[in-house]
């Protein structure tokens, strides 16, 4: 799909609102542990500054649920952006309050203003029209460079676009790059095409799994979500994470895979622990022998070998979601091994999702991946063939 191009806008000396995705992982001390998403936005910001624009940056961080929560403040983000841009970044104390509106109206060419966390406003996730209008009133132009949230119909992503005509809005360089690359994979993936899907819950990836099945040849399941599938097959999963309300859906996914001839793999062994802790007692067991009150926190070595074999002949790999609780060293081995399998393959490799991107960076194989998407849910929805809400109004109209 062809998007409205930032280079076709007459930005010189104007005020530009850039929706970025600075929802980056933070450590327990409030430090940024992976600034990839921040660095990815710099080219669009610098392009606007080169046009002598006054730049307003907006993002969310975490899920403050419409309230001001200090730990979700964008103070560390503004500090990091300031370092990357090598110029002062002014942080407003609110989103569309008196302070933000005053600073936005007084912003001069070459200056950068960052609004506080968009999700401090309850209307952001509700796609509130009044909030969209207030955000739009701050600038002459709107740029969406937040691929990671473009699957959300939120005020700063979708609602705001209705207050700008096609000559005053466009995709940023990062959004364009993501759409272009993933679009090629959708249209013509080199086969066999495997999807590795992990993470804690089926619920967040249920629809994506259903819609991906007709497009892929193999699906490899890991992470906490595997136990919902195993329970549906009748196995005792102890105290492992399970979504009982989705057991029927899990069954439907497996039935659909069988019908389509898609090979659907589940773990054959797991690393279980007596509690969710780094100092837990752990052991490796078959998926048929998970003890009562123990929980599965990683895939086991037999599963790692099986998945390595399954991936040995694939030509395209989409990986979304870790294989276990990779944040704890004791339960990171499965994810780390799969990361090395993917990195060492000759396949086109696409990594999607913040946790998976964080994982491959932690173990130093990020440069071996063909493409690391800044969006997890967004990349899955795009690969399903959906038009993302944040992209829909940025598509160039024919004729």
Swiss-Prot record:
Pfam families, sorted: PGK (PF00162)
EC number: 2.7.2.3
Residues that bind ATP: 205, 296, 327, 353-356
Reaction catalyzed: (2R)-3-phosphoglycerate + ATP = (2R)-3-phospho-glyceroyl phosphate + ADP
Main location: cytoplasm
Record's subcellular location: Cytoplasm
Subunit composition and interactions: Monomer.
Annotated organism of origin: Sulfurimonas denitrificans (strain ATCC 33889 / DSM 1251)
Protein name: Phosphoglycerate kinase
PANTHER family xrefs: PHOSPHOGLYCERATE KINASE, PHOSPHOGLYCERATE KINASE 1, CHLOROPLASTIC-RELATED
Record GO biological process: gluconeogenesis; glycolytic process
Name of the gene encoding the protein in the UniProt record: pgk
HAMAP family for this protein: Phosphoglyc_kinase
Protein keywords: ATP-binding, Cytoplasm, Glycolysis, Kinase, Nucleotide-binding, Transferase
């Amino acid at each position: 799909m062809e998007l409205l191009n930032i280079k076709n806008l007459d930005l010189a000396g104007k005020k530009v609102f850039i929706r970025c995705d600075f929802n980056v992982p933070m450590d327990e001390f409030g430090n940024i542990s992976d600034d990839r998403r921040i660095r990815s936005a710099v080219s669009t910001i610098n392009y606007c500054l080169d046009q002598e624009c006054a730049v307003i940056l907006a993002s969310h961080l975490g899920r403050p649920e419409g309230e001001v929560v200090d730990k979700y403040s964008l103070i560390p983000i503004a500090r990091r952006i300031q370092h990357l841009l090598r110029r002062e970044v002014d942080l407003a104390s609110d989103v569309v309050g008196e302070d933000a509106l005053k600073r936005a109206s007084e912003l001069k060419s070459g200056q950068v203003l960052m609004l506080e966390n968009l999700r401090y406003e309850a209307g952001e996730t509700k796609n509130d029209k009044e909030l969209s209008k207030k955000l739009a009133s701050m600038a002459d132009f709107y740029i969406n460079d937040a691929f990671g949230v473009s699957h959300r119909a939120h005020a700063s992503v979708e609602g705001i676009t209705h207050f700008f005509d096609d000559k005053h809005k466009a995709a940023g360089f990062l959004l364009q790059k993501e759409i272009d690359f993933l679009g090629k994979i959708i249209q013509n993936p080199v086969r066999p095409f495997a999807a590795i899907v992990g993470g804690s819950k089926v619920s967040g990836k249920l629809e994506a799994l259903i819609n991906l099945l007709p497009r892929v040849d193999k699906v490899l399941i890991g992470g906490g979500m595997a136990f919902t599938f195993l329970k549906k097959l009748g196995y005792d999963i102890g105290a492992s994470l399970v979504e009982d309300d989705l057991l029927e859906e899990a069954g439907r996914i497996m039935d659909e895979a069988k019908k389509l001839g898609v090979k659907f793999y589940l773990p054959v062994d797991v690393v279980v622990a007596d509690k969710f802790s780094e100092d837990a007692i752990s052991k490796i067991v078959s998926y048929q022998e998970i003890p009562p009150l123990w929980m599965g926190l990683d895939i086991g070595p037999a599963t790692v070998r099986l998945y390595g074999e399954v991936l040995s002949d694939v030509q395209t790999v989409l990986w979304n979601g870790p294989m276990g609780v990779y944040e704890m060293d004791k339960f990171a081995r499965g994810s780390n091994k799969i990361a090395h399998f993917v990195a060492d393959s000759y396949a086109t490799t696409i990594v999607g999702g913040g946790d998976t991107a964080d994982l491959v960076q932690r173990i130093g194989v990020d440069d071996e991946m063909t493409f690391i998407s800044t969006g997890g849910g967004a990349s899955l929805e795009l690969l399903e063939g959906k038009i993302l809400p944040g992209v829909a109004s940025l598509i160039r109209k024919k004729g």
